[in-house]
Amino acid sequence: MYAALIESVVKILQKAEFSVADLAETKPRCFDIVARKDDVVLLIKVLYNVDSLKPEAAEEMKKLTKILQASPIVIGERFKFDFLERGVVYTRYGLPVINLATFYDFIVEGIYPYVYSAPGGYYVKLDSERIREARERLGLSVGDMAKMLGVSRRTVKKYEEGTDTTLSTAAKIEEIIGTFAIKEIDLLNFVEADISEEEEVEGEEGEIIEQLRVIGLSVYPVRQAPFDAVSQAKEDQILTGFKQVREIEKRARLLGRISEAIDAEAAYITDKACKKKVESVVFVLKEELYSVSSAKDFISLLKEKSCEE
């Protein structure tokens, strides 16, 4: 069931001409698919029942969203005891959750959802400016509008300040003003996250991070991904691996697929000599890292190694 859902998501993305990389080969992971089209980068977590999303995975996904300037989306079919409904956005640990049909509508058809689920039912975001302009154009006072809706003047003022409301109330407002009164939900800008590069990492990995920072890179450690940090220097973004695992080339290959999908550089820092590169991933010996004195020199080293056979 999970594999079929992953396959369907990949097909939808390919139909919409996204570059796609899936992470089915790695665990643990905070996202299953990364995709890019033009300036849009998506980090996608796929779960049949979204109850199984862990809070630490959600936090890591939000952090990566900020670092990579990406948009996180969780895709599933069930939430708690119910099936997810088409056209409705749910929320889990601050991440947007939608079903496969809603994802298809959004990615392929360009149809944004308008309804979100929250305790108490389904709600919509009101277009406050449009409501106020329509009321004034019709010559209705706030009191007139309140009387027609059966609510207080204060409530109408809240609607015109942008408060959210139920579907039934939104329908009444639209009937009165004679125009569309709700806003689409922007799935690409759903999440706001704060990040800090000052996260402490101990041992040999911490030493590598410290050296990258010494030469002038901003370094954001990452968990639950096939890379260990995102290193940044001005406009250069480098997915960076440095865990000395047994199958280092296999991990680097997966890292390369992700970097190619999002059009980023990729480097793997190692204790001992490996191949010069695997796909788009450049291997850098620790001693080479310690021999460079600036971020600019490090980027030059990567480009130089990338051109070598």
Swiss-Prot record:
GO-annotated molecular function:
DNA binding; DNA-binding transcription factor activity
Could you list this entry's UniProt keywords, alphabetically sorted: DNA-binding, Transcription, Transcription regulation
Q: Which residues bind DNA?
A: 142-161
Q: Does the record bear Transcription regulation in its keywords?
A: yes
Membrane-crossing residue ranges in chain numbering: none
The HTH cro/C1-type domain covers: 131-185
Instruction: Answer yes or no on keyword DNA-binding.
Output: yes
Q: Which NCBIfam families match?
A: PRK04140.1
Name of the protein in question: Putative HTH-type transcriptional regulatory protein AF_1787
Q: Which organism is it from?
A: Archaeoglobus fulgidus (strain ATCC 49558 / DSM 4304 / JCM 9628 / NBRC 100126 / VC-16)
